[in-house]
Amino acid sequence: MEKYDLLIVGSGIVGSSLAFYSSKNNKKVLIVEKNFTGFNSSGNAQGGLAPYLGTDNSAKKLHDNSYSLHKEFKETFRNYTEVNPNYNEKRLIHIIDSAEEKELLSNNFGYKINNDLDFVKNIEPKLKKINHGVIIFDDYMEVDSFNLTNSLLNSSLNMGAKIITHDFKIENLQFNKNKLESFSTKDERFLIKNVAITAGPWTSEIAKNNDHINVKPLKGQLLKFKTSQKFNNSISWGKDYATKKKDDLLWIGTTEEDVKFSEGKTEEAKVKILNSFNKMFNDFGDLNLIDHTACFRHTLKIIFLL
């Protein structure tokens, strides 16, 4: 019977990252995936590695450390895999959407806020307005989210990890006196020491809606257009963004829909995304819609204690 230090349920970006760094630290890893790696949001996300704009110092430290790991993997992934994550360094222009956001950002970024539309239009001529100002970040990267997820997974496999296709249920785990002992499928049994359920918005459902796992699904839709127009920067405002990716398509998003697991793209979302984009930009008269995607990401459930 095979023995593993860690069972990982789900091979999205979190599961694949965990598999990579665990394997790198000489842990024996078993990954269980129901579909294929990058099946949902981990393979369809915009892939922007944007700066942390909040005020929580611990969250900022975590973000900074994560960004450093991205920079490291960008330089070293070829040591582990042939799957290129396609990191792309570019400039990010974040447009401040409200007076409240500006006040919040002033605490940490006041010195970087620029209110000069003419100056900003020299960088991105197609912008119509900058609302309450912008912050320009030169240290910014985008990545192909599908490739990154598969690059990390493939790296872990090349270091000895194993992946199996299985629709995991919590009943697949066996315990001995409340201590985790093994994981079983219909055909195999594996001895395991630890388990990590990294199934995004499905995590709570898999874990039998455990109250300690307070995640829920949030649907996001995005549009991909062919255009002859140059667009060298990544622009974000509110929850929305526009960026031209390495596939030479203009990616525009996004929605944040609290609709549980209601699947599918909608015309309403398409109109909403385009309206937001057209309010911000001029001179995109040749947009040709190539793709419209919808996927689920996870967000925290807000629990009120009465």
Positions of predicted regions on the chain:
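Active-site substrate-recognition segment that forms the wall
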Residues: 14-24, 47, 83-88, 194, ...
